[in-house]
Amino acid sequence: MHILSKSTYIKGLQCEKALYMQKKHPYLRDKLSIEQRAKFQRGTDVGVLAHEVFPGGIDMSPNSPSQFPKKVQETWNNLSNPEVKVMYEAVFQYNDTLIMLDILVRDGNKWLAVEVKSSMRLSDTYYNDAALQYYVLHGCGVPLSDFRLMYLNGDYVKDGPIDVQQLFKMESVMEYVIEREAFVAENVERLKKVIALPHSPLVNIGTQCNNPYPCDFQGHCWKLIPKNSFLFSTAMDDEMLFQNYFNGVSTNAKMLQQIEPDSEEAHQIEALETNSYYIDYKILYSLAPQPKPKSIAYLNLLLYRPAVPELEGTRPYEEMILAFALQGEHEHDAAIDSTPPTCPGRNDMAADGCFVWDCFDDHSRWKEAIDLLIEKLSHYELVICFTPQNLSTTLLRHDIIQNQTVGYKVFNLFEVLQEAHFYHPSIKRGLTLQRLETALFNDVKLFEHSRILLEATSNDLLSYQQAREDLITENEIVAKTYQLFFK
């Protein structure tokens, strides 16, 4: 039985305690976020498609962990079988470390190793991942002609059936992984000793809790930190926060002695103490729409960014408008378009003055949204939204904002609140509409999971109905927020 795997090795590089907890106390992990679930699904889909770059291979994936020893042996048998040209998820084990290599291709008397990533850029984690796999392969005596990372080509434009040879790019990392072999060997021995400890290693909370990824044991490791601690401030980076923490600054009162009294940092700590929000009203009001608009609409876009382009003329992760809701402040008519037969009761989704459109049933219709938005937005002077994306850029990209009939100004509450240093203890490290609703109105009606799933994969049928409801609810929250600060 193996001790380390690719995922546990990477986790151990980030934090020894997190590695120990995952191996010995996995039940203490935080609940897997919906974002992570969607990301895993996307990675799996891209990995399967990548097999077509080297077709005709044998899938070595085990059905359960109990099959690992069997699959290791089968992999070895295939290495010596000249009839086997390609293997997917080939299983190797060396020095108590197990890997499953995405693609292994016979290359004369040697083998080409390929690890697939669903991103358009390669990160340090991906290189560390490859270095571990090379360490195991080399330790097993597998002769390699090259080791490559395969990732999505951001310049690829779909023109007919997906051309996998053009969709993916490959980068040789052979030189890098050879240079890192000694480093990997040292870490493997160190991390095996960590796992063998009779108790978890004494590792304090620190910058590693969120770098390079948010740790899924924060709920356990941070349980003794007060919920209103200055460590949850966003006005200071983690380096500064933990530098003070390790120097004995353990309370908000002590932290206030280290910073300027009227600074953003101080105001955030006061908000933590009183469980209230802080905003710089001087900045906020300087950003207010001028002159006061006579007609206002609240726009909510649900964008879909498929890793593998679905429609002609699109690129990997290129956004398309999957749905939108438009709420006019003084409209009294309601209309809903595109009702698929699989969604009974859809007409009940109409809210007073709200227009909802989607193409869940047929993504090829997504450009209809552009014509609809050009026509409907032309009736307003101000279009208000709440999105981390730059909505003006999105509208420009799709020629919505350049249309001559459009004379409105886009007002993104997300950007405005951030510029005005809005902060609330419930928001902490991420401003979302759901958290904003809790902070300002002490209410939680919004279910954001459907939005996240649809933006990542757009194949969760159960989320469609919820997403339509959320589009309307989100606009209501945006309207309440705008009216709170600017009316």
Predicted region positions:
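Long, highly charged low-complexity segments
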Residues: 252-308
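Acidic, Mg2+-coordinating catalytic module of metal-dependent nucleases/exonucleases
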Residues: 162-227, 441-487
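Conserved RNase H-like, two-metal-ion catalytic cores of nucleic-acid enzymes
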Residues: 92, 284-376
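Short acidic-glycine loop/turn motifs at beta-strand connectors
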Residues: 106-110, 328-331
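Conserved DEDDh/DEDDy metal-dependent 3′-5′ exonuclease domain
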Residues: 84-90, 94, 98-102, 113-116, ...
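Flexible loop/turn segments at secondary-structure boundaries
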Residues: 28, 121, 156-157, 252, ...
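Metal-dependent nuclease catalytic cores that hydrolyze phosphodiester bonds in DNA/RNA
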Residues: 1-109, 239-272, 459-460, 473
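Helix-loop elements that line ligand-binding/catalytic pockets
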Residues: 203-212, 216-253, 278, 352, ...
